[in-house]
Regions:
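ATP/NTP-dependent adenylation/nucleotidyl-transfer catalytic domains that generate, transfer
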Residues: 1-197
Length: 197
């Protein structure tokens, strides 16, 4: 199948449909890496026509295109409007799989990494969505077809992610509900900025 690691982590695939194939060629490649690789090739291939096509693909919103287009011909169903920005989800996924960080630490790291791009409410909203989907969609990953591991982490049930299909996200979501909104890097925001407590 063509699904990537980001889609598999979020369960953004139809069970026994597009998630099932003889071989999952992109199963350990996060969506943002796919985008960077396509952009790199478009910039370096030396073929203008191919480069233009690849750049057009990158400019097209991610969509399963299951709904008819809008009257003006634009895509009606945009994945990131429904599940959130893949750059955030890939960030969360990396720190969960590679380092096993807790939700609060990932939230604080994301606030630092995406400062100016996303506000703290947006980061928290999509982190909650990520945890809900990551746990609730494990049943889809438990029966994935074979595929290569090309990075430092993957969601394969035969290697990196040995998680039961009925695992519950409650503890992780409870931690996110109790976060101190003024906390950055584990200390109050005024202290982190050089101020006093």
């Amino acid at each position: 199948g063509t699904g990537d690691m980001s889609e598999l982590a979020l369960g953004w695939a139809t069970y026994n449909g597009d998630h099932m194939s003889m071989y999952g060629v992109n199963c350990s490649v996060p969506k943002m890496l796919v985008r960077h690789l396509v952009r790199y090739y478009a910039d370096t291939c030396g073929e203008k026509e191919l480069s233009d096509i690849l750049l057009d693909v990158l400019d097209t919103p991610v969509s399963p295109e299951l709904l008819p287009p809008e009257e003006d011909g634009k895509i009606a169903q945009k994945t990131e409007d429904l599940v959130g920005p893949y750059e955030l989800h890939d960030f969360y996924l990396y720190y969960i799989l590679r380092f096993g960080y807790r939700p609060g630490k990932i939230y604080r790291l994301a606030r630092q990494a995406f400062d100016g791009a996303y506000d703290k409410e947006t980061i928290l909203k999509w982190l909650k969505v990520f945890y809900r989907r990551f746990f609730n969609q494990q049943f889809k990953r438990s029966c994935l077809p074979d595929g290569p591991k090309v990075g430092s982490a993957a969601v394969s049930p035969r290697g990196d992610l040995r998680m039961p299909s009925d695992a519950c996200s409650r503890l992780w979501l409870e931690e996110l509900e109790t976060l101190d909104e003024d906390c950055v890097y584990g200390v109050p925001e005024t202290k982190a900025a050089g101020g006093s407590l």
